[in-house]
Amino acid sequence: MLNFKHLMAAALLLSTSLGVQAERLKDIASISGVRSNQLIGYGLVVGLNGTGDQTTQTPFTLQTFNNMLSQFGIKVPAGSGNVQLKNVAAVSVSADLPAFAKPGQQVDITVSSIGNSKSLRGGTLLLTPLKGIDGNVYAIAQGNLVVGGFDAEGRDGSKITVNVPSAGRIPGGASVERAVPSGFNQGNSLTLNLNRSDFTTAKRIVDKINDMLGPGVAQAIDGGSIRVTAPLDPSQRVDYLSILENLEIDPGQAVAKVIINSRTGTIVIGQNVKVSPAAVTHGSLTVTITEDPIVSQPGPLSNGQTAVVPRSRVNAQQEAKPMFKFGPGTTLDEIVRAVNQVGAAPGDLMAILEALKQAGALQADLIVI
């Protein structure tokens, strides 16, 4: 059994010597089983200013509306299937149920149009049950939407749209009705899961905890998980974890990576990226094609016809680029300076990095997203 008073005293002593590059344990790891749960529901938004679903094209909206009316004892006459409800929209409602959320607490919800509603601005979400993956209702949502975008259309068909008016949020729009069972207070141990698996970081966490509490209190399961002995008393367990999660850990250096987004031209080069000795030159070839048609005018009394004769001019120009050389163990700063000296655009830099990787000179993972 852990000596909890000894733990408090040791933690107080360790808190006076924190590393400069250290990070809190709570920022790099989470407790197994302590997580949020996703909820989803289907409902109706009413009160729209003529921007709701076109019910002839979205029959499920009218069906949902009729089902709601029947719950209030209102029967819709037969043959009214072509009724237009321009101020009603069918929506999906989603929310994250935080860990340890209790009945009566409020959570934020996101409301998104399912049909062809133009805008949910000014709408009110009617009572909507939110279910978990197990089919149970964990929260009830209702309230007025906050929509950041808007949509406007003129009589001539001109239209302007700002942001996304077909989705919105309701802060505190759902009331928790059922708590999710948690295994936090069960057993004599807890498992810490690293946000990024790293054997060096896992070992440093184990060493830090064992130095403070004694050998064998923390054990590494693998590069991403650590098992820690914990008090059986729930109140002591909370105090115990409040100390552990504030421990300062010096995490291991991340794997060297170069991330390339080919769609946006964004390139991110990690700090640990290095280049082996290599020489690089990257030319820029520009091909210009211009059309300069001429008019052929026949001579008088020749019975000829005036005609347009195409005339194309093709010009190819290649810009000379100086060669730059990477020495052994070239760092990120040196890579950036060398690339800037030749004036390489993002597209050129992508080609250079890919060529370096193929040549075996780029000591990093090249990831294209």
UniProtKB/Swiss-Prot annotation:
InterPro entries: Flag_FlgI (IPR001782). GO terms for cellular component: bacterial-type flagellum basal body, distal rod, P ring; outer membrane-bounded periplasmic space. It holds the Pfam family FlgI. It is found in: Periplasm; Bacterial flagellum basal body. The keyword rRNA-binding does not apply. One of its GO terms (molecular function) is structural molecule activity. GO terms for biological process: bacterial-type flagellum-dependent cell motility. It comes from the Bacteria. Residues 1-22 form the signal peptide. Keywords: Bacterial flagellum, Periplasm, Signal. Assembles around the rod to form the L-ring and probably protects the motor/basal body from shearing forces during rotation. The basal body constitutes a major portion of the flagellar organelle and consists of four rings (L,P,S, and M) mounted on a central rod. Belongs to the FlgI family. This is Flagellar P-ring protein.
